[in-house]
Amino acid sequence: MRRWGTTERVVGLHDPQVNEHHLESTGLPADNRLRLLSFNIQVGNSTEKYRHYITRGWQHLLPHNGRAGNLQKIGDLLSDFDLVALQEADGGSIRSGYINQVEHLAHLGAFPYWYQQLNRNLGRLAQHSNGVLSRLKPTAIEDHPLPGPKGRGAILVRFGEGPEALVVVMMHLALGGRTRNLQLAYVRDLIGKYKNQVLMGDMNTHAN
């Protein structure tokens, strides 16, 4: 039996992927405000009601005709933002038609910089990923596997140098409260030395 994703993930420092066709889109808008969005795209599925998790659950495993249209709508929405965190994107497998959805949305939204974090590698069956899309060139991108069962990750994106730099952590946390607290403690340690911090993503919990 073939085993996927058995390689141990470690913290990694990466450069962003560059979308050469949209380098003219770099920089902040005229009002100098950074527009942020976090979006769990559910592999491009359309989930409107709780029952759809059952009736449309097969769409998380297999390709379907509506996915391309859903991604186009998402891409149109993303074009209004400067920095986007994506959760539940597929990095290119049978269910997504072998399309890297992070890269695809970077093209649709005209983002010059993007990065895909692969958290669960199931080969051709699924490439469970987080992603970041940015109009500003990151100074550094850190890829962090989170504590707890394998398959959860955080991306730390840094703009600038030293303690005055802006750090943005994009994450998809666990369902269980105990593991989620461990993951948040890990993130807290990551950002402690920075003055300007933004946390965004799918926390799988409600704000208190």
Each predicted region: which residue ranges?
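Active-site catalytic loop in hydrolytic enzyme cores
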Residues: 135-165
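Solvent-exposed loop/turn segments connecting transmembrane beta-strands
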Residues: 123-125, 147-151, 176-180
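Active-site metal-binding loops of divalent metal-dependent hydrolases
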Residues: 39-41, 89, 171-173, 202-203
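Metal-dependent phosphoesterases centered on the DNase I-like endonuclease/exonuclease/phosphatase
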Residues: 177-208
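Active-site neighborhood of phospho(di)ester-bond hydrolases with catalytic His/Asp-centered motifs
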Residues: 85-87, 115-118, 198-202
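N-terminal, active-site-proximal structural segment of metallo-dependent hydrolase catalytic domains
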Residues: 1-108, 121-122
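A short, structured active-site edge motif that brings together acidic residues
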Residues: 111-124, 144-146
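Conserved beta strand-loop-helix elements of the APE1-like EEP
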Residues: 107-109, 124-140
